[in-house]
């Protein structure tokens, strides 16, 4: 049986919020079967919980924000992407502020944290959402689609009218039955343009952004001393973002996601449309792991 999994141990990290610029203490904790991923604002009294579900998304400007009344948690997508990539079903994410720390701008540090905490299988079957037919949302020339696929595959195409990105790979497709999230996607960093920074900061966005936690691009090139981690890092980061956004379904997917110039808003619209169209999906689990179209690395002992 493919089982649900959580963390073996509690683990902590410190960072800054990309948009708020605030110092943030992050604690990842094990959670019982069928809890899902739940964010906790531990700086508030009483503590406020926000489950990582599509219906709780309140803002999608530059990041995905979860809300519960007037309480919010910003920039959840990179951590959720790491949770999805490592198959974590149940965990508590405690924060000392309103934003998940940006770390290095990728999911890599979160993967390291989760692997350091160790993974623990639980005594319940892992639930998957299987896509049964095409579901699409569009906004102008932007598009996001779910398709049936016997596995999990994410295809993405970006089209930035920028001299530097014009020369880079702007499309990618990753079939996770033949390659790993950790290897292919997890280290791709978020990116931003110098031309946008003044506008963003005027609107209290990207206050914590720097070359330490993002790829920064001006009209002539990439400003980061070490350059790109891969030629397709820009589009791979959009895949990373999409995987995090899709995990707001609350379960791992069996199907294909295709995005064309899609972002957090359109990704969330697609999830809401899928959830509403109950004939487009089904919940499945696998008593025999060898029959499943998706496999996960075996849990290893915590380091």
From Swiss-Prot:
SUPFAM superfamilies: Ribosomal protein S5 domain 2-like. One of its GO terms (biological process) is lipid A biosynthetic process. It comes from the Bacteria. Keywords: Hydrolase, Lipid A biosynthesis, Lipid biosynthesis, Lipid metabolism, Metal-binding, Zinc. One of its GO terms (molecular function) is metal ion binding. Its EC number is 3.5.1.108. Gene3D superfamilies: lpxc deacetylase, domain 1, lpxc deacetylase, domain 2. Its cofactor is Zn(2+). Pathway: Glycolipid biosynthesis; lipid IV(A) biosynthesis; lipid IV(A) from (3R)-3-hydroxytetradecanoyl-[acyl-carrier-protein] and UDP-N-acetyl-alpha-D-glucosamine: step 2/6. It catalyses: a UDP-3-O-[(3R)-3-hydroxyacyl]-N-acetyl-alpha-D-glucosamine + H2O = a UDP-3-O-[(3R)-3-hydroxyacyl]-alpha-D-glucosamine + acetate. GO terms for cellular component: membrane. Zn(2+) binds at residues 78, 237, 241. The keyword Coiled coil does not apply. The active site is at residue 264. It is an enzyme of class 3 (hydrolase). Catalyzes the hydrolysis of UDP-3-O-myristoyl-N-acetylglucosamine to form UDP-3-O-myristoylglucosamine and acetate, the committed step in lipid A biosynthesis. Belongs to the LpxC family. This is UDP-3-O-acyl-N-acetylglucosamine deacetylase. It comes from Pseudomonas entomophila (strain L48). The lineage of its organism: Bacteria, Pseudomonadati, Pseudomonadota, Gammaproteobacteria, Pseudomonadales.
